[in-house]
Amino acid sequence: MINVNEFRPGITFEFENEIYVVISAQHSKQGRGQANVKAKVKNLRTGAITIKTFSGGERVEKAHIEKISMSFLYNDGVSIVLMDDSTYEQVAIENTKITWELNFLTEGIKVKLRKFNNEILDIELPAKIELKITSTFDAVRGNTTTNPTKRATLETGYEIDVPLFIKEGESVIVSTEDGKYVSRA
């Protein structure tokens, strides 16, 4: 059992016959009232992200998730295909379960497949990924008041804001948690 006061990003738990992973947790206490915990959680079966409120001290069942190292092979439009690095076994996961993760998948990238009692749930990406910029426009002179950025399209089709000095064809490091530019590769 896990006390909800110990919620941290990445903790997995069972609640109301569903399996969740904590994305973020905020603890609050009002005056004389009981403390509560607002947790932004992702349902690992459906991929839905919701906010759940728990009263302080409440306990939930820990979900023991098996993580298997795999390589991304390809996306056929309906599902992605992964290959186990040790057994060469291939596994397909529906795109509807991993809509956010699709923004960062490139051929050969290493991911972790999450399983619960032999049920395939979803994938876990590395915290930061190197991706190539396929298109961006040149900076406009004089548009440099405070921390100027411009839109850029990555090789996966995902769009991010990058600093003005980044050019088309360069590689950048992107955070997979919030989808933002981190640094030049």
Curated annotation (Swiss-Prot):
**InterPro entries, per the entry:** Elong-fact-P_C, NA-bd_OB-fold, Rib_uL2_dom2, Transl_elong_fac_P/YeiP, Transl_elong_KOW-like, Transl_elong_P/YeiP_cen, Transl_elong_P/YeiP_CS, Transl_elongation_fac_P
Q: Which UniProt keywords apply?
A: Cytoplasm, Elongation factor, Protein biosynthesis
Q: Which GO terms describe its cellular component?
A: cytoplasm
The lineage's top-level taxon is Bacteria
Q: Which Pfam families match?
A: EFP, EFP_N, Elong-fact-P_C
Q: In which pathway does it act?
A: Protein biosynthesis; polypeptide chain elongation
In terms of SMART domains, this protein maps to: EFP (SM01185), Elong-fact-P_C (SM00841)
Q: Name one GO biological process term.
A: peptide biosynthetic process
MF GO annotations: translation elongation factor activity
Residue ranges annotated as coiled coil are: none
Q: Where in the cell is it found?
A: Cytoplasm
Q: What does this protein do?
A: Involved in peptide bond synthesis. Stimulates efficient translation and peptide-bond synthesis on native or reconstituted 70S ribosomes in vitro. Probably functions indirectly by altering the affinity of the ribosome for aminoacyl-tRNA, thus increasing their reactivity as acceptors for peptidyl transferase.
- Report the family membership: Belongs to the elongation factor P family.
- Matching HAMAP family: EF_P
What protein am I looking at?
A: Elongation factor P
- Species of the source: Mesomycoplasma hyopneumoniae (strain 232)
Classification lineage: Bacteria, Bacillati, Mycoplasmatota, Mycoplasmoidales, Metamycoplasmataceae
